[in-house]
Amino acid sequence: MVYGLNVKPEHGYYVKVNPLDGDISRIEVVDQTPDGGLSFINGMRGASTMGRAVKLAFVPTRMQWADRNRHPIPDFASSWILNVSTRAKNLIEEFEPRVHQFLPVDYCNIDGLALESRWFLIVCNRIDSVDRNHSRMRLAKGVMWTSTDVENPKLVFSEEQARGYHLWRDKHLIHGPFISDILADRIQMEGLTGFYGTRADSV
């Protein structure tokens, strides 16, 4: 089974987060070799969602978690760039060691006091995981799955194509990332916060 790795606010509202250094608009993907999928987008949040490692030059190393109610940061958070706690990092690396890019980032609270050392998570599996025979979607220009002009659209993942992967980006989809049911189950069993897994259709 396949799940979308979504992030939810733990206390009913999204917290404003401010980069304190770096320049997210200038972050670039390291290897931009075409692979038949989506073109590689640099800057803002694009580079961090392409399924390949990013250059470190402009990645922030300090962020402010501006929660006036002073709640802790969940294990999974999506502010600017998907970021995780050390607990979440260790669990992911238990399944896929030395695969993904974990970039250290220090968070402070609204008063500027140290809050937590965390990790930007750059997913580094970029695969084609959609089942073409069972999906009712259009592969626009042979590059991106879209439901535009499709009657009763349906996206179905291939368990065969995703076999052996636990965390990935699909090279033909603008959303994601996606995770295996095994990893989703462990995240929930360990009680990691901020995670909201949505089960996707798969065959």
At which residue positions do the language-model features occur?
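Phosphate/anion-contacting hairpin/loop surfaces
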Residues: 1-203
